[in-house]
Amino acid sequence: MAKTSSVEKNNRRRKLADQYGPKRAALKAIIMDQSKPMEERFRAQLKLAALPRNSAKIRIRNRCEVTGRPRAYYRKLKVSRIALRDLGNNGQIPGLVKSSW
């Protein structure tokens, strides 16, 4: 089980990313628009820099929904390899069969 503080920190980052997502996208569109004057683009860049760092989507870490483990994460199932194995052995994931040869 991951530290609760790490999981909560990641949840705060998700909430901030959802909250500031549209504003960040609008500012980035202004910054990337070559037809806008340089001063306006620079002001948009300063506004973007003033936003919280944790509101950037890139700072969100994929974590297992069951254990909070940050590594060996299956995106499709949103669980780590260890949780996947445990859930599969318990028969809680339909269609997953333990391999044996």
From Swiss-Prot:
GO terms (BP aspect): translation
GO molecular function term, any single one: structural constituent of ribosome
InterPro entries listed in its UniProt record: Ribosomal_uS14, Ribosomal_uS14_bac/plastid, Ribosomal_uS14_CS
Region (Disordered): 1-21
Pfam families documented for this protein: Ribosomal_S14 (PF00253)
Keyword terms, alphabetized: Ribonucleoprotein, Ribosomal protein, RNA-binding, rRNA-binding
PROSITE patterns from the UniProt entry: RIBOSOMAL_S14
Cellular component GO terms, alphabetical: cytoplasm; small ribosomal subunit
Disulfide feature: none
Family label: Belongs to the universal ribosomal protein uS14 family.
Quaternary structure annotation from Swiss-Prot or TrEMBL: Part of the 30S ribosomal subunit. Contacts proteins S3 and S10.
Biological role: Binds 16S rRNA, required for the assembly of 30S particles and may also be responsible for determining the conformation of the 16S rRNA at the A site.
NCBIfam families: PRK08881.1 (NF006477)
Protein name from the UniProt record: Small ribosomal subunit protein uS14
Name of the gene: rpsN
